[in-house]
């Protein structure tokens, strides 16, 4: 009898835990995805902060020339970064217990791999948690679908690209200047500026910013007046009120007269679908472009593609970019190789002496 009561009590505790995890009445929704999201994101954040402040230099190129990235080793907020895991480790799974000591783990850039893998798992669980909460509230799943765009972009630069290049040392450093360095090197090695998927991503990001600004300004400029002409239109509203505060017909009419009639939306759902879909699809394409360039399916190379009737080259902007790429590549890993492969492959001229 005693054993039966204890079993019921334990089942009751588990049931209460399940109800708490899946409850939509709590201040912050946990969810089953949150059970995994919380520890992984806390781990990634904690290790990032500690490593950004105090991590010793990392032998990123695997040639015994460590690169400093932390604040205590001479960097500031702009130049500081979590240095990627050493090329000597490659794509090997490198937890702390795989190293002979913590010093060796730090020297080989172990924190980068730890942060990146926990972060990617955490943001994927956050996306799942968005779907889970939407499902329990009876909502449609498009919030999680929209969030899949930045998740795909992060996965591309932190996981797919290193896999394609054969080493986590080619992943994006976790810092401001490290991000810019990654972008410059990516251009030098893959000519991303001439890749159509990157162009779609730029159109998505900048177009999304433009449309967001246009929509926000139209909404805040077309209030339904609840006051007299002698009072401010803002006086008729309370922050967070349930009643509609703007007139989409007025906004549609204004924008239609500003450009032309069919340039504006007269349906709120169509408008907001467009505002969500434009940047999301653009970022999806960018992530796909990074993932294909990871395996060296690079951007277009229109090298000296325009010539006159005499066969003389007429330079285009594509040629200017091609001229800049080797220079950027020379600056990258300057001690790992003397010249980029496309320069080193050229036969050296004979020197008479």
UniProtKB/Swiss-Prot annotation:
Coiled-coil ranges (or none): none
Site description Stabilizes free radical intermediate, residues in chain: 190
Sites marked Tyrosine radical intermediate: 161
GO biological process: photosynthetic electron transport in photosystem II; response to herbicide
Residues binding pheophytin a: 126
Modified residues (N-acetylthreonine): 2
InterPro entries for this protein: D1/D2 (IPR055266), Photo_II_D1/D2_sf (IPR036854), Photo_RC_L/M (IPR000484), Photo_RC_L/M_CS (IPR055265), PSII_D1 (IPR005867)
Gene3D superfamilies in the cross-refs: Photosystem II protein D1-like
Purpose of the protein: Photosystem II (PSII) is a light-driven water:plastoquinone oxidoreductase that uses light energy to abstract electrons from H(2)O, generating O(2) and a proton gradient subsequently used for ATP formation. It consists of a core antenna complex that captures photons, and an electron transfer chain that converts photonic excitation into a charge separation. The D1/D2 (PsbA/PsbD) reaction center heterodimer binds P680, the primary electron donor of PSII as well as several subsequent electron acceptors.
Protein name as catalogued: Photosystem II protein D1
Organism: Conocephalum japonicum (Liverwort)
């Amino acid at each position: 009898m005693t054993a039966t009561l204890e079993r019921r009590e334990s089942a009751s505790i588990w049931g209460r835990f399940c109800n708490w995890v899946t409850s939509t009445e709590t201040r912050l929704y946990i969810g089953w995805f949150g059970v995994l999201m919380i520890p992984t994101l806390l781990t990634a954040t904690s290790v990032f902060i500690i490593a950004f402040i105090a991590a010793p230099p990392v032998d990123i190129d695997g040639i015994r020339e460590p690169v400093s990235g932390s604040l205590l080793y001479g960097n500031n907020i702009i130049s500081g970064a979590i240095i990627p895991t050493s090329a000597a480790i490659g794509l090997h799974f490198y937890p702390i217990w795989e190293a002979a000591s913590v010093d060796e783990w730090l020297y080989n850039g172990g924190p980068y791999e730890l942060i990146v893998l926990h972060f990617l798992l955490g943001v994927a669980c956050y996306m799942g948690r968005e779907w889970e909460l939407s499902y329990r509230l009876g909502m449609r799943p498009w919030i999680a679908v929209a969030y899949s765009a930045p998740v795909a972009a992060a996965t591309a630069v932190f996981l797919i690209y290193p896999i394609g290049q054969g080493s986590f040392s080619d992943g994006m450093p976790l810092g401001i200047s490290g991000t810019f360095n990654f972008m410059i090197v990516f251009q030098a090695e893959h000519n991303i500026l001439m890749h159509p998927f990157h162009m779609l991503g730029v159109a998505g990001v900048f177009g999304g910013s433009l449309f967001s600004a246009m929509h926000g300004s139209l909404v805040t400029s077309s209030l339904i007046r609840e006051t007299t002409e002698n009072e401010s239109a803002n006086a008729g509203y309370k922050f967070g009120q349930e009643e509609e505060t703007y007139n989409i017909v007025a906004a549609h009419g204004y924008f239609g007269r500003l450009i032309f009639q069919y340039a504006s939306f007269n349906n709120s759902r169509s408008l907001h679908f467009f505002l969500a879909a434009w940047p999301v699809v653009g970022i999806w394409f960018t992530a796909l472009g990074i993932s294909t360039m990871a395996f060296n399916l690079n951007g277009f190379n229109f090298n000296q593609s325009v010539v006159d009737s005499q066969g003389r080259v007429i330079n285009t902007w594509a040629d200017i970019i091609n001229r800049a790429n080797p220079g950027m590549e020379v600056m990258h890993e300057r001690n790992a190789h003397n010249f980029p492969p496309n320069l080193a492959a050229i036969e050296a001229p004979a020197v008479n002496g």
